[in-house]
Amino acid sequence: MARSTGKDAQALFHSLRSAYAATPTTLKIIDLYVGFAVFTALIQVVYMAIVGSFPFNSFLSGVLSCVGTAVLAVCLRIQVNKDNKEFKDLPPERAFADFVLCNLVLHLVIMNFLG
């Protein structure tokens, strides 16, 4: 059996890229927000590994804030996606209001955790 992993990977990358090109701009913006939140969490973890985690509550609050915000944004993306049949009757304004309310609750809990 011939090994064509390079060609297969290139074909997979090309198909993913062409499928993502057809994604609406609103979903791409949400994806960018999720990527930024995860990137910020990774920066905090690297900083903690290099410098230390003396105020551990602050480090934990920052990372949980980033991860929680990313999870809520993924939920928003699922609800706003027009191809998703499960949330077809849910208007995008309602989904965004849910996102804002859940983000508010998340950050209130995180501020309470800080002390």
Swiss-Prot record:
UniProt GO BP: protein N-linked glycosylation
InterPro entries linked to this entry: DAD/Ost2 (IPR003038)
Functional description taken from the UniProt entry: Subunit of the oligosaccharyl transferase (OST) complex that catalyzes the initial transfer of a defined glycan (Glc(3)Man(9)GlcNAc(2) in eukaryotes) from the lipid carrier dolichol-pyrophosphate to an asparagine residue within an Asn-X-Ser/Thr consensus motif in nascent polypeptide chains, the first step in protein N-glycosylation. N-glycosylation occurs cotranslationally and the complex associates with the Sec61 complex at the channel-forming translocon complex that mediates protein translocation across the endoplasmic reticulum (ER). All subunits are required for a maximal enzyme activity.
TM spans (from-to): 32-52, 56-76, 95-115
Gene: DAD1
Keywords for the protein's UniProt record, in alphabetical order: Apoptosis, Endoplasmic reticulum, Membrane, Transmembrane, Transmembrane helix
Subunit structure and binding partners: Component of the oligosaccharyltransferase (OST) complex.
Pathway: Protein modification; protein glycosylation
Family from the record: Belongs to the DAD/OST2 family.
Topology in membrane: Multi-pass membrane protein
Name of protein: Dolichyl-diphosphooligosaccharide--protein glycosyltransferase subunit DAD1
Lumenal compartment residues: 53-55
GO annotations of cellular component type: oligosaccharyltransferase complex
Lineage: Eukaryota, Viridiplantae, Streptophyta, Embryophyta, Tracheophyta
Cell location: Endoplasmic reticulum membrane
Record flagged with keyword Endoplasmic reticulum: yes
Cytoplasmic domain ranges by topology: 1-31, 77-94
Major subcellular location class: endoplasmic reticulum
